[in-house]
Structures are given as C-alpha cells and as structure tokens.
C-alpha cells in the first residue's frame, strides 16, 4: 500500500496543506514541512516554483516569484527533501507543471522523486488524453500521478477517476486557485460520481480557507486541500512563518479530523 493510501486509511478524512518550496527560502520550507506534519497534516503538497504557473491565483504566483528570487532550483528542492526524510515520513506530493519536469528530464526527475521518498505528483497542465508517457514513468518509479477533476461532464469525471492513483484532487470551482468566500459547486455529487468509478479517495481543493469550509468539504469527500490560505501566512510572516502556519494547520486539521 502506498503511503498516500495508508494516510487515508488511517485518518479517513485527510487534511492536506500546500506550500511553495523555497518561499521564503528552503530552510524555512524544511521547517514548515516538519511543523505541519507535527500539527496534524496528513499529506503535504509542495509547489515547485515556476515562472508561469497557469492554474495559480496571485497569492501563489507571488510565492513562486519569492522562491525563484531566493535561488530555489529543483535540485536544491530534492536536496532539502533528503533532510526532511530524516525528520518525518509524512507523505509528500509535488504540484508542478510539465515544463519544469521536462526541462529537468522527466525520467531523472521521477528517479529523484523515488530516491528522496516523494509519494505523488500533480501536473495541472497535462490533460488526461496526453498523460500516458508520464503515467508510465510514474509507475516505473512508484510515484502516484494524482489527477485533477474539475466540475465537468459525468463521463469525463468518471473517465479521469477510473485511472486515478493516490487521490483524486477535486477542483471545487473553475478558474485559478485562491480563497473563495463560498464554494457553490455540488461537491457531494462529484464525489459520488468519482466513487462510482474508483476506490481511490477524493479530496477537495481550490478556495478553502476556514475550518468551517474545511469541515464542510471533508463531510462530502475524503479530505480538504488548502493552498492559498497557507501561502498567504507564509507571505505575511516571511522567515517567522513557521509558528503561525503551524497554528493554522492544527486548527484546520482538527476541523477535518472530527468529521466521521
């Protein structure tokens, strides 16, 4: 059983925070991963900074710029993760675009994921129809290729879910990432369609910021993913962000974990 599958089995409802690697610097990223795991995060998503992150709103775009300005590279992220793995075995997932993977060398990238104990990757700009070569290499190196499912036709939702590994990332609303005041998509109906097609868990992301929203989303799926709200705290506190992020993650994880 993969570590991601084990996390959902153990917790039933998972809380999954996202941060951009290298924002404000990689030392702080390392501390954040460990602190978030200790605060109750079941899985941690890490963004690889990229100059053109098409699915991201302004909060995460700004984090990408800060991380790149701090000299963050993919090699330095892998080196940092080696250290992380001496401190925590929390499942780790990269959220990245195909360009940084392709530029790095797809096979080399996935071999390095395997060697640092990275558990999954999410690549928003690779459509389902074009994922076969990447999926094959992911399987070769034991890395789950986690699909994004947006509010779309029943057939498409089921087609993507049927092939899913790790978890299905349900995009709660169309558009870019960011905090929403309310989420209007019928998540329960989407989860139901996904469950008809696969046993792989489904977690909801895009726009969750409060414990109430996280609890609400966990009630109709298998977990809540929170990115922009965490990255906002990192942006506000800079190198002093570890404690405030940890406090926020603890509150959010408690809200998700109390859902039965």
Regions found by a protein language model. Name each.
Residues 15-19, 44-46, 92-96, 121-123, ...:
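Hydrophobic faces of well-ordered beta-strands that scaffold small-molecule active sites
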Residues 41-52, 118-122, 127-130, 172-178, ...:
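Glycine-rich phosphate-binding active-site loops on the catalytic face of alpha/beta enzymes
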Residues 26-36, 152-162, 204, 208-224:
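Catalytic cores of alpha/beta
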Residues 48, 59-123, 256:
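Active-site beta->alpha loop and helix N-cap motifs at the rims of alpha/beta catalytic domains
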């Amino acid at each position: 059983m993969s570590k991601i599958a084990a996390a959902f089995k153990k917790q039933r409802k998972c809380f999954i925070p996202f941060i951009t690697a290298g924002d404000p610097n990689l030392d702080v990223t390392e501390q954040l991963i460990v602190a978030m795991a200790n605060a109750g995060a079941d899985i941690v998503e890490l963004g690889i900074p990229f100059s053109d992150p098409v699915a991201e709103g302004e909060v995460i775009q700004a984090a990408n710029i800060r991380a790149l300005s701090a000299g963050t590279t993919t090699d330095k992220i892998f080196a940092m993760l080696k250290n992380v793995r001496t401190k925590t075995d929390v499942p780790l997932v990269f959220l990245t675009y195909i360009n940084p993977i392709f530029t790095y060398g797809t096979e080399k990238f996935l071999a390095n994921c395997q060697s640092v104990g990275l558990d999954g990757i999410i690549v928003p700009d690779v459509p389902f129809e074009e994922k076969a070569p990447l999926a094959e290499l992911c399987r070769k190196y034991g890395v789950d290729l986690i699909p994004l499912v947006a509010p779309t036709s029943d057939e498409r939702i089921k087609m993507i879910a049927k092939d899913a590994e790790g978890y299905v990332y349900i995009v709660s609303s169309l558009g870019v990432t960011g905090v929403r005041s309310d989420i209007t998509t019928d998540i329960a109906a989407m989860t139901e369609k996904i469950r008809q097609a696969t046993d792989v868990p489904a977690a909801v992301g895009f726009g969750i910021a409060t414990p109430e929203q996280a609890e609400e989303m966990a009630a109709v799926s298998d977990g809540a993913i929170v990115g922009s709200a965490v990255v906002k705290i990192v942006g506000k506190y800079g190198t002093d962000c570890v404690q405030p992020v940890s406090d926020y993650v603890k509150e959010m994880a408690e809200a998700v974990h109390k859902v039965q």
